[in-house]
Structures are given as C-alpha cells and as structure tokens.
From Swiss-Prot:
This is Increased DNA methylation 1. Interacts (via N-terminus) with IDM2. Interacts with IMD3. Part of a complex made of MBD7, IDM1, IDM2 and IDM3. Transmembrane segments: none annotated. Residues 475-498, 523-597, 1031-1157 are annotated as: Disordered. It comes from Arabidopsis thaliana (Mouse-ear cress). The lineage of its organism: Eukaryota, Viridiplantae, Streptophyta, Embryophyta, Tracheophyta.
C-alpha cells in the first residue's frame, strides 16, 4: 500500500477525496469510536470487512480500485438490489492484463492506478470497504485485492454493482502490469449479485452475496439440488447440472415428460427420453428442445432475435446467473404459455452453448463465443450479421474473406462506417458515425498482398454503409476463410479497372482468386447491357434460340460465362438468304416442373404442428373458423326465423360441432339446421352468432385472410435475363431444351410435339391457335371476331366457326364452341354447393372458388360463396396433409392451393382456371377430396385425389371416384384421365378399372392443356360410349393440325376459289357428330350463356318449338351461308334449346335457382338464380385476373 502522506498529496487541494473528507465520512457512518472496536455500520448495520492493517489508509476512495459491492437491507441482498445500472451515474474502469507490464501500472495519462499493490506485496489479499447512499438506499462495497491475477482477464474497477455486474475472480498474477481503459457503466456488463472470491480470502464467505431462491421451489432427484440460502458459483465448475435443472422446469411446465430407461443387461448407461404432450418421443435433447421452441413460438414473434456474445467463462456465468434469477422469481407464472415462450427464448442461447454446440471448453480458455437467439434464425439475417461484423472491423476480430474473388454490393443504411481497410493481418474500423442522408461509394480495388508487402498495403477509399438492416451479403462465404494478409495477389481477367459511379449496395461473390472489388451498381447494370449487345453482335443468328444466361459470381467474367457451352447456345444458320428462320428455342435447363410426391406419415404431424391446424382435430368449417380465431369456443350461435327474426334454436360452438341447448347434444352444423326445421341442402342465411354477426360474414372474414395469405405467399421469380418463357415443357412438365411459343410463355420439347424438324418462321402453341385453321388467335381482338370457349378453353376465329360476319351481342362474356360444352358448363355450375346424399350417412358435393371481384352481389350468392370457399380451405388442409408442397421454381406458385382455388396464370401450364373440387363428407366432417377439370365432352382430368389420414383404407376414395364418374357420365363426358404415381399404377388399374394409354391417344392429348407431373403415368377410363366418331382422334388429326409450319391457308375460310360463299363443314372440339342427335352442334354461331333475347338475330326470327326436331336426317351438319337457311337453322336451334332447358330444369330440381326459371325457353340460360350468376361472375373475374397478370 502507498503511505498515507503520498495519498494525501494525490488528493490535491480539493476537499473531495481528501483525508478530511474521508474522516468525516467514517464518523458519519461508523461513529466516532477512536479504536474502531465495532465493525458494524451505524446506518445500515452492515459488517465492515476492513482488515486491521488497512483501517486508516485512505485508499478505498479511489475510483480505480477493484470493487465488489452489494446493497445492504434487512431482507437480504435480492430484495433491495436494483436491476438497472443506469440509475447510478457512476463510471467504471476496465483493466486488461498485459503480458509485459507490472502491477505497478499507470494509465494512458501517466497517472498511477490506485488500489493496486506493488510487486513486493502482490501476494497479499487486502480487503477494503465503502458505504454509499443513493436514491435506492444505502449500499456497501467491499474492495478485494487477492494475491494473484490471471493473465489475459479483464477486471472492472470502481462503481456501484448493479443487476448486470460481472463477477470478479482475481486469480494468480505473474507480476504483470495492467492496462486501464475507461468506459461508461452503460456500455459495460457488470458482475452478478453473487460475487465469488478465492478461498484464501479471510472473509470470502461473508463477502459473498447469496443468490436467493424461492422457498417454494421444488427440485426433482434428476436435477441439481440448490441451497436455499446461498449458491456459490465457480466459473470453472460444470454448468450443465444447473442449466439442466431450469430446462427441466420449462419442459415440465409445458407438459413434457422426462423418462430414464436402463439399457440392456451388462450396461450401466441410462437413456433419457423426452416425451411431448402429444406422445412423440425424442432421444436427443437438442431435437426435443427445438421441438419445444417450435410449439411455444408458433404464434408469437419475439422482439429479440439478435445474437449473444460472451468472452470467457466469467462473462458467460454473469449473464446466465441473471437469467436464472429472473426465471426463479417468475417461476410461478410458468403455467402461462407466453411466459414459457419467453423463458425458452431466454435459455435458448445458453442451452445451445452448453448442450448443443458444447462450447464451454472454449469459454474456459477465454475465447469469444457468439450464438444466435432462437434456433432457426433467418438465413439472410445471419449473413447480414456476419458481413456487418466483417465490415465494421471489430477490434477483437479479424476480417476474413473467402479464397474466391468477391464483389462488394448492396449496402444501404442510416449509419455510415468510415473504415480504412489496410491489408495486414487485421483490418479494423477507425470511425463509426451515424448519418441520415445517403452517400456515394467510390469503387476501388483492393488486392491482397503477402505479409512481406504489408507495408505497401493498398487502402481503399471511404466505405460508406447505408441501412445496416438491409442485406449486405448476397452469397455465402462457403469456402475456407483466410485472412487478407494470407491471400495472394491476383489480377482481373478481363477488366483492368472498375467504374467509379455511385454505389447503392455491396455484394460478396466468389471467384477462384482472392480479390475484393468495390463495384458500383450502376456500372454493373451498364456492363450487363453491354455484354448483351456484344453477344447479340457476335452471334450470326440473332434471336434464333433463346437461352437463359447463367451469370458467374464475378461480373468481370460475365462475357466468358454467358458464352460457355457455345455449341448449345446458338444454332448455326445456313447461308441461304431466302430461308426462313427457325422457331425460337431455349437452352437446356434442369429446373423442370414440380414432382408429385406423397407426404410420409411421419412428417404429417410436424407439418400441422407448425401451422394453425391440429392433426387431431376434425376437418370441419367450424374447426377451421376456430383455428383462424374468427369465432371462439363456447360462443353462442343462433338460428332465426327469416320472417320475424325471432330466435328458433340456440347452441354453443365447439370444435366438434354445436351443442344444442334444447337437447344438450353435440351435433354438426347441418344437423343443427335440420333440427330447427330448415333445409340443410342450401346455404343458410338466417344463421347468426350471439353478437348478431351473420355466420356467413364470419366465413367471408376467414376466407379473406386465407386469400390474402395465399396470394401474398407466392412471388413471381423473373429470370436473370428477363426471359419471359417457361422453364418446363407443357406436355410432360420436365425441363430440357425447349421450343418457345412466339405468343405466350409456353415451351415444349420437340419430341413431345412429335416434330421431326423445327418449324420455320414464327411458331405458336395450341393454346394460342384456332382449333380449326391452326392459325394464331389474337388476345387483343374483339370478342365478336375471336373468342375462347368458356368450358374447353379452346380458341376459335369467329369466321372459322360460323362462316359469317353476323354475331349476336353477348352478355355476359361467356362463349361456347358448341352445345355440348354449354351443357357441361351449365351442368357443373348448377351442381356447385348442392349436397348429394349417399349411403351410410355420407354425402358428396361439388365446390368451386368464388374469386374476389369487389362487386356487390345478392345475399344468396354471398352465402354460397362463403360456404364453398370455407369448405375449399378445409379441403386444402387434406391435400397438404397428403402431398408435399409443389412450388414451381419458375414462378414461385404453390400449385396445390392454386388448383383447389382454381386460380389462373399467364403460364398455360399453371392456368388452373376451370378446376372443380369434389368432396365427400359425413356429419360436416370432410373425408376425401378430388380436383377435376372437364375439357368439353372429350375428356376430364383428375390430377389430385386425397383422403384424410384418419379415414384411409376404409373405401372412401372409391366412393368419391364413383360419384365423380356418375356425374361425368350424366354430362356425357367420354373419358376420365388420372396422373398416377408409379407405385399406384397397379391400384388404379386393378382396383378402379383404369387402363394405360396407347401412343395414338397420348398424341391426341398433346393439344389439351392437362396438369402433368414429371414421373407420373397417364391412365384412362372410358365413361360414356357415344355413337359418333372418336372426338379425341378427330380433334388432333385434322389436315391443318398435322401441318406444323403454320403456313397461310391457300383459300380464305368460307370462300371458294372464285371468292364466292361456300358450304363449310364445322370442326369444333365436339362437332364430329351425326346430324339429328342430341349432341348436334349449334349451327352458325357459338351459343353464349345469357344471350340477350331482346335483340333477335334477324327480323324474321321467331323462336318456336320444332316438333320435328328429332326427325332430322342422319347426316353431317352443313352450314349454308344463305340468309334464309341461316334463319331457319337459328329457329330450330332456339326451339331445341328451349326443350333442353326444361329437361335440365327437371333434372336439377333440387336447385332452387332452376325451379324459378323452368319453362322460360331460352331464358333458362339468362334468367338464372344466384348460383348461375355466380359462375358467370367467376368467369369474368378469372378473365380480369389473367389480364391483370
């Protein structure tokens, strides 16, 4: 210790800190006892730990002394301790041990560090004390200097201990000198309330402040037994038992079980199993811990998702002790889900370090350990954190880069980091300042050098980072990292210099050499454009073959990368100038389409625990509404009389149904309506919640949330070169070298189209051409000229189909190429939402999603929309339970929701408009689901069929398929096609009667837009045997279709060689039929749904019944261009359609809509109820959505 005289000299002339000040302080707090016979404070009663050899030495007032402190109060340390160190305006000094200095140290200003012994008394342990008052009460501090200090440790000097203090353990010292670094209290972490001291200290046990625990805490035999009065934590002890104790408490609070089982005979080891509340067993602790976190954090967002860092075991124990104290104080609230989630998040970093990554040994060595909060942090955020640490140049870390060359790109922040990056063993940041305005970054090149050339280090200009929260690293540093000083110099391959335009961002990208380049974003875009121009100039054949460019990870190598595989990139053209260019093709790619894969039963549980649905709950609309939190359990539901709005029945909503108050039975929602005397076969408009809110409004509210989530969940991924074409074949769904359509994004394999050579000139796919003349049908043409059939989706020229320029005004815009498509369309639309009872209490119904059009509709249509869309959301859960998610790599579209919600797309392969969903239910519980799409009367496809896991192997799928086949046969659909997995081909063929297709039938289907999956097998089943020739063969074997050149017709359609009108045989998708049959096509024009009957097609037209309609001669229908014959054919068609309207009305008498309009002739197509208008509006919505896309 320093002599008292020297201490007085250090005090200066100021009174504060002088000997007199210290004497007054001692008299106030310790009385005027001259001999200091008592060691208890007069104010607080705290014991003075000062030893006899240091009582009258004025050294404890120095702010640079080692401090251990605590608050004195009658209830103990924990009751009065403050957890916020910011309440005290104190400062501390951090002492970092140096290996080449003595304990007789001085700080940067040359002042001696008070409180440290010289080397001759370094082996003594000198306790000092200090009692201070503050707004929190009176605090006492005990200053301890042990006989040794460990080299490389950090010691905090001075200040009042707060709730975030670091524990001090001053171990052996080699007589080295300290280096003191002043820092404010708010920027340092402090010792915990319980201070550990060495065993050699005489008053170590008294100086230790106990870590108080609740008296009610129970400790199981498998956990660490803790003392109720004092817990002495030694950083060198194993932290696993203590941490495991609290982990077990969190698991037990979450209703998990921990079982120990002995291994087989002869082994003394015991296995531990962690069992979830659902009965799932985990052998590994890490998997159980992550599963617990996934359940607790499923519906919650934690604010703290950063990282935690510790340097040494002392720092780790300091943070852990505070966390455990907080958990112990709030242990009684662990029965709350929010509290369990909070404490799981608090313990997660410690559990990862101790049990999962097992880095305790690294902490004991004094190394720095960093761990992310939560187990599954976002990958991009993780990359941002790594790159920010690299750029900021932390003093304790070294900026490392990959062996590859990098481009720095994409930094946008509200703070700027001025850093001089010097190529040495360490790159540090010199200055960090915040700024709101955006700055520019001048690109400079930094090349790595050897250590011998470190003095010549190339220094980059100021590196200004903007918006640290955005991504600053777009490529993973996945190669072996090394210091910049170890990277050998390398030169650029093609570009000697980089543009110095302003940068908006940085980008790290890889190259085989070890350079870092700072490049401007503007120059990068300009260089890309130049590369494209150069490539187009170099290729002798411009635009012949469209290939997706694969950019390398260095823009300076862009040119060489784009032109790799040059043999496949472009097709050499012949030198003949008269030869027409070939059709465009795409370079071979391996992306392809999505494969149909079933979900294994072991992954089903994990899939549904991550979402809102529970696999154990029933698949009903009520259960879905409860899961979406639109309605709550035990909420009152009422059935009211539509006449006087009086309550007829009342019940309580549960997950299993409705508890009827009159009979106290749990029934389904349909039985509840039937119990009240209402028809359960149609949407109920008089069903209300207890709050007065209509039940249909609750369904629409839940559907709105589902619609937004699904629509916003997918994104359109554009190709790197803005290639608009698809990456998958429209026939087989696989990738490869593809032929591009010149009108739409569709692409095809040449072999799938059965083409021997590429067609010359522009080439158009079947979705863009007329099905009669095979010429392009423009989407921008007026509806009166060209149109698309609303049922089979085939396109036609108006002149090709009817041969005349006269057309009727159509409202709404629903077109048909023939009466067969119209009958199929009306038959399916009239069955939407209708419940068809079956045996054993089962029922089936057809559903179709009603799009969001923003229009005002009738209450009946809104109720039907709410019912159908809600059931489709439930059906989607069964599909997702049965199949793995199929996200298209080109567009990002999740195909299964798009199929069930019949959403359209600009990509023909992903255009699922026209799909219907057929479901089988029992007591409102959905059992089986199938998606179907009917392409006229030619063929219907059923790509997806699924059954709820609870009802599998009970024949439910067979009941569903039988209902679909019966419905299609009533609509006279010829064939049903399924895409079968290889493992289920035998089941479909032997159990359901399907057969493989021959080559001719597969070729006939190539023009039809089927939903196909790579690796599946197409199977067919004949449903309706017609007397007409095979429409499948007739459709695709016409003369024009077999000519792939798309040459112009020699003669104008409808005219002979002399240019006069001629008789033209109609060849629509369903018109190769004998005359006089029920399947006869409409003569002269496509029949629209809802045709305006107030405007006749001619003055002499008078719709009347044709009594001899069935006595027509059996010959092929020929349309005459003459005016009189046209009017006569029109009258016959109107008369026949009137009778068919009555037959259709009688067949679907269960629909209230058709009952209202029976007997109205052709008006049955126009004056229909809300169900029919719904289908029309839906078609309009689909068209508008496609136009918007």
């Amino acid at each position: 210790m320093l002599p008292g005289a020297e201490i007085e000299m250090l005090g200066g002339d100021c009174f504060e800190g002088s000997y007199e000040d210290h004497q007054i302080f001692r008299e106030v707090f310790f009385g005027s006892d001259p001999g200091n016979t008592t060691k208890r404070c007069l104010v607080t009663g705290a014991i003075n730990f000062e030893c006899d050899s240091s009582k009258n030495v004025n050294s404890s007032l120095s702010s640079n002394s080692v401090v251990t402190s605590g608050y004195a109060c009658p209830q103990g340390f924990e009751a009065s301790a403050s957890r916020d160190g910011s309440d005290f305006n104190t400062k501390a000094k951090r002492v970092k041990l140096s290996g080449n200095k003595h304990l007789d140290a001085r700080d940067e200003k040359g002042s001696a560090l008070h409180g440290f012994p010289t080397s001759d008394i370094a082996r003594e342990t000198i306790p000092l004390h200090l009692v201070e008052s503050s707004n929190k009460g009176v605090s006492t501090s005990s200053y301890l200097l042990k006989h040794s200090i460990v080299k490389g440790r950090e010691v905090y000097l001075g200040g009042i201990v707060s709730g975030k203090c670091k524990s001090l353990n001053l171990d052996k010292c080699d007589g080295k000198e300290f280096k003191a670094i002043a820092s404010p209290v708010s920027q340092e972490s402090f010792a915990t309330r319980m201070i550990s001291v060495g065993a050699s200290t005489p008053h170590s046990e008294k100086a230790c402040f106990p870590l108080q625990l609740n008296n009610g805490s129970k400790v199981s035999p498998n956990e660490l037994i803790m003392s109720k009065t004092c817990l002495k934590i030694d950083p060198k002890e194993d932290p696993r038992p203590l941490l495991y104790k609290y982990v077990c408490k969190v698991l037990t609070a979450a209703r998990w079980k921990i079982e120990k089982r002995e291994r087989s005979a002869g082994r003394k080891h015991v296995d531990t199993f962690y069992i979830s509340p659902e009965g799932r067993k985990f052998r590994e602790f890490g998997s159980a811990w992550k599963a617990l976190g996934g359940i607790l954090l499923a519906d919650r967002k934690l604010m703290d998702t950063g990282t935690k860092k510790w340097t040494g075991i002392n720092d780790f124990w300091s943070d852990l002790s505070l966390t455990l104290l907080d958990i112990e104080e709030n242990m009684k609230n662990l029965n709350l889900a929010n509290t369990r989630a909070l404490w799981w998040s608090a313990l997660e970093p410690f559990v990862v370090v101790v049990f999962i990554s097992k880095q305790v040994g690294s902490l004991r060595k004094g190394n720095k350990v960093e761990v992310a909060r939560n187990s599954n942090p976002d990958k991009l955020k993780k990359e941002d954190t790594i790159c920010l640490n690299l750029i900021s140049g932390c003093p304790e870390s070294v900026l490392t880069v990959s062996e590859g060359s990098h481009l720095v790109h994409d930094v946008d922040a509200n703070q700027e980091i001025h850093s001089d990056l010097e190529v040495q063993t360490k790159i540090s940041s010199q200055k960090v300042s915040s700024r709101l305005e955006r700055q520019s970054i001048i690109g400079k090149e930094i090349s790595g050098t050897h250590e011998q050339e470190a003095s010549k280090g190339i220094v980059a200009s100021k590196l200004i980072a903007e918006d640290m929260h955005e991504s600053v690293m777009r490529k993973n540093l996945h190669r072996r990292s090394k210091k910049i000083s170890d990277i050998k110099p390398a030169s650029l391959d093609q570009h000697d210099s980089l543009d110095s335009n302003s940068l908006n961002s940085f980008e790290f990208q890889d190259k085989e050499m070890g350079n870092i380049h700072l490049v401007s974003k503007g120059s990068r875009d300009e260089r890309l454009r130049n590369e494209k121009m150069n490539n187009s100039c170099c290729n002798s054949k411009k635009g012949r073959k469209k290939a997706r460019k694969h950019y390398t990870q260095d823009d300076d190598l862009m040119g060489s990368t784009i032109t790799r595989n040059k043999g496949k990139f472009s097709r050499s053209s012949q030198k003949k100038k008269t030869q027409k260019p070939k059709a465009r093709t795409k370079k071979r790619n391996n992306r392809g389409g999505c494969r149909l894969l079933p979900r294994s039963s072991s992954n089903v549980e994990n899939h549904f625990f991550q979402g809102n649905w529970s696999i154990l709950g029933p698949r009903t609309v009520l259960s879905w509404l409860i899961a979406t939190k639109v309605i709550s359990r035990d909420e009152v539901i009422q059935l009211r009389d539509p006449d006087d709005d009086t309550v007829v029945k009342t019940g309580l909503v549960t997950k299993d149904g409705v508890v009827c108050t009159c009979c106290n039975k749990t029934v389904s929602l349909s039985e509840f309506k039937n119990h009240a005397g209402f028809n359960q076969n149609c949407p109920c408009l008089n069903l209300f919640m207890g709050s007065g809110k209509p039940f249909a409004s609750c369904q629409l509210e839940a559907w709105s949330a589902e619609y937004k989530a699904r629509r916003n969940g997918w994104r359109l991924e554009k190709a790197s070169d803005d290639d608009p074409n698809d990456d998958s074949c429209g026939v087989c769904g696989d990738g490869g070298e593809l032929i591009c359509c010149d009108n739409c994004p569709s692409t095809f394999h040449q072999a799938c189209l059965s083409m021997q050579v590429l067609p010359e000139g522009s080439w158009y796919c079947s979705s863009c051409t007329c099905w009669i003349c095979s010429e392009l049908v423009s989407d921008n043409a007026e509806r009166s000229q060209d149109f698309k059939c609303s049922q089979c989706a085939h396109k036609y020229h108006g002149t090709c189909l009817q041969g005349i320029s006269k057309r009727r005004k159509l409202f709404p815009e629903t077109y048909f190429c023939g009466k067969n498509c119209e009958k199929v369309y009306n038959g399916l639309s009239s069955r939407v939402g209708i419940i068809n009872p079956n045996a054993d209490g089962l029922s089936w119904s057809i559903l179709k999603c009603f799009q969001e059009d923003g229009m005002v509709h009738s209450a009946r249509r809104l109720a039907l929309k709410a019912e159908c869309n809600s059931k489709l959301a439930v059906a989607l859960s069964i599909m997702e339970e049965s199949f793995l998610s199929m996200v298209d790599p080109r567009t990002g579209i999740d195909m299964i929701p798009h199929v069930l919600y019949n959403w359209g797309s600009t990509f023909a392969r992903l255009d699922f408009d026209g799909f219907y969903t057929v479901v089988v239910e029992k007591d409102d519980v959905m059992i089986s689901v199938a998606s179907i799409r009917v392409h006229g009367v030619t063929i219907a496809e059923m790509p997806l069929v699924a059954t709820c896991s609870k009802y599998r192997r009970q024949g439910m799928c067979r009941i569903l398929v039988a209902a679909i086949e019966e419905m299609l046969m009533s609509l006279k659909v010829e064939k049903l096609v399924v895409a079968a997995l290889p493992s289920l081909v035998e089941t479909w063929t032997e159990g359901f009667g399907f057969k493989p297709m021959d080559d001719e039938e597969r070729d006939a289907l190539k023009r039809i837009n089927l939903m196909v999956f790579p690796g599946t097998t197409l199977l067919k089943k004949t449903l309706y045997e017609s007397t007409k020739p095979s429409t499948m063969k007739g459709v695709c074997l016409s003369k024009e279709r077999n000519n792939p050149s798309n040459k112009e017709a020699d003669l104008e359609p409808g005219l002979d060689k002399a240019g006069s009108p001629m008789s033209t045989q109609v060849e629509s998708c369903d018109q190769m039929v004998p005359a006089g049959s029920d399947d006869e096509p409409s003569p002269g024009f496509p029949v629209p749904l809802g045709a305006d009957q107030t405007e006749p097609t001619s003055e002499t037209e008078n719709p009347s019944r044709d009594s001899n309609a069935n006595d027509r001669p059996n010959k092929t229908t020929v349309v005459s261009i003459g005016e009189e014959e046209e009017e006569e054919c029109l009258q016959k068609d109107v008369s026949k359609l009137s009778e068919e309207g009555k037959e259709t009305t009688r067949a679907s008498s269960s629909s209230a809509a058709l009952e209202e309009v029976s007997g109205l002739g052709l008006g049955v197509v126009n004056n229909v109820s809300d169900e029919m208008l719904l289908c029309v509006d839906e078609q309009l919505d689909s068209d508008s959505s496609q136009d918007s896309e």
